[in-house]
């Protein structure tokens, strides 16, 4: 039973009537462009075929009822006419409540909803299960009540909910790719303008995601420290964001900066340049150049931004040794664990799977999880 069938069946069973709509929003993997989004820079993610699915129907009153199928059918119920506050014990509820609260501030021309939520985006892996949930919930209200909101606005609404209601200082990329993803393409996103350019993926290339299963937490962690260091760097150059600083300007005065801040700034500036070049390499089908750029990105995250861990570096080394220059591999996501992403010819997938299975656990004591993904369509009805 797929997620659509599962949520529709559960909806009918619990609520006693059929759902009118089923909405999906995908998770994502970022191919290159890490920690550039909140610096107004460029990112190159693609949506993946793992998603949050919500079967839903409008109500004729002002109540929102939510069932979380993946949490033993836990229930949340709240009124649109009372102030929406955080839930004491159900963290998943706060993503739903936050999205609805911020939607009310944008356009409150909507009423109650019944919904059943389920998803298969791996949680805590850096594949944006939370953004997928936020975009799915926003799309539910937009579709059921014909709200005049486009994908970018639904994405921004989700980001606001996560920043202000949930309390995690994320950038815009995760929500934007979930809302705007295009099948068989990556998106080069300008995080300042929110402009997105579809970049076709070469034929016969697999997007492989390997979860290190080294546990990471983002909320309240090193992520916010990195963000502050980047803001310190932008202030030093008297610019609104690091996006506005050139590598030449940085190199001329790097020695005047705090050494740690200088490393963080160098990563962001070089990563922005790599990301723009990667989009054109991908479009030309130049997997060799893409691989070089991904390798440089990983080294920069490891040495300048200092967000990798030994388990992740081990995974990258195993994959790189297997594929050589036929594709690329790097850490993806916020850092401190999580996943690596590899772009490799489909016929090399079995060899990579085997090499990782034979070596990773032996070296780290942790068993990996291996996903082969397809670049997928963004949020909408399914």
Curated annotation (Swiss-Prot):
Keyword hit for Methyltransferase: no
Function (record text): Catalyzes the transfer of the gamma-phosphate of ATP to D-galactose to form alpha-D-galactose-1-phosphate (Gal-1-P).
Organismal lineage: Bacteria, Pseudomonadati, Pseudomonadota, Gammaproteobacteria, Enterobacterales
Signal peptide: none
Kinase is among the record's keywords: yes
Entry-linked InterPro entries: Galactokinase, Galactokinase_bac, Galactokinase_CS, GalKase_N, GHMP_kinase_C_dom, GHMP_kinase_C_sf, GHMP_kinase_N_dom, GHMP_knse_ATP-bd_CS
Protein name as it appears in the record: Galactokinase
Pfam families associated with the record: GalKase_gal_bdg, GHMP_kinases_C, GHMP_kinases_N
GO molecular function: ATP binding; galactokinase activity; magnesium ion binding
Site (Transition state stabilizer): residue numbering on this chain: 28
Catalytic EC class: transferase
Keywords from the UniProt entry: ATP-binding, Carbohydrate metabolism, Cytoplasm, Galactose metabolism, Kinase, Magnesium, Metal-binding, Nucleotide-binding, Transferase
Organism: Salmonella heidelberg (strain SL476)
Catalytic activity, reaction form: alpha-D-galactose + ATP = alpha-D-galactose 1-phosphate + ADP + H(+)
Binding site for ATP: 124-130
Gene3D superfamilies (alphabetical): 3.30.230.10, GHMP kinase, C-terminal domain
Record-linked SUPFAM superfamilies: GHMP Kinase, C-terminal domain, Ribosomal protein S5 domain 2-like
Location within or outside the cell: Cytoplasm
Gene field: galK
GO cellular component, one term: cytosol
Pathway: Carbohydrate metabolism; galactose metabolism
Catalytic-site annotation from UniProt: 174 (proton acceptor)
């Amino acid at each position: 039973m797929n997620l659509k069938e599962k949520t529709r069946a559960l909806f009918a069973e619990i609520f006693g009537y059929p759902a009118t709509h089923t909405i999906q929003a995908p998770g994502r993997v970022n191919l290159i462009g890490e920690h550039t989004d909140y610096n107004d820079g460029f990112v190159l993610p693609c949506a993946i075929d793992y998603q949050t699915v919500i079967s839903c129907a409008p109500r004729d009153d002002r109540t929102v009822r939510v069932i979380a199928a993946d949490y033993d059918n836990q229930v949340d119920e709240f009124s649109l006419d009372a102030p929406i506050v955080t839930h004491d014990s159900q963290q998943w509820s706060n993503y739903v409540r936050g999205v609805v609260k911020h939607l009310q501030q944008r356009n409150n021309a909507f009423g109650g909803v019944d919904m059943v939520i389920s998803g298969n985006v791996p949680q805590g892996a850096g594949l944006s299960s939370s953004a997928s949930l936020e975009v799915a919930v926003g799309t539910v209200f937009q579709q059921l009540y014909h709200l005049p909101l486009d994908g970018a606005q639904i994405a921004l609404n989700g980001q606001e909910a996560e920043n202000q209601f949930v309390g995690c200082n994320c950038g815009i990329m995760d929500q934007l790719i979930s809302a705007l993803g295009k099948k068989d393409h990556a998106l080069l996103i300008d995080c300042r303008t929110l402009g997105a350019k579809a970049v076709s993926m070469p034929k016969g290339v697999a997007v492989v995601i390997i979860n290190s299963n080294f546990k990471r937490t983002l909320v309240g962690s090193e992520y916010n420290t990195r963000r502050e260091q980047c803001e310190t760097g932008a202030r030093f150059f008297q610019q609104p964001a690091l996006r506005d600083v050139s590598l030449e300007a940085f190199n001329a005065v790097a020695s005047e900066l705090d050494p740690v801040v200088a490393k963080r700034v160098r990563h962001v500036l070089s990563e922005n340049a790599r990301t723009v070049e990667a989009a054109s390499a991908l479009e030309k089908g130049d997997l060799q150049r893409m691989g070089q750029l991904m390798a440089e990105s990983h080294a920069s995250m490891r040495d300048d931004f200092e967000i990798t861990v030994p388990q992740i570096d081990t995974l990258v080394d195993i994959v790189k040794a297997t594929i050589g220059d036929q594709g690329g591999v790097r850490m993806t996501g916020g850092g401190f664990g999580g996943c690596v992403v590899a772009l490799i010819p489909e016929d090399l997938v079995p060899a990579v799977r085997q090499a990782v299975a034979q070596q990773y656990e032996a070296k780290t004591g942790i068993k990996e999880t291996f996903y082969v993904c397809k670049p997928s369509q963004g949020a909408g009805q399914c």
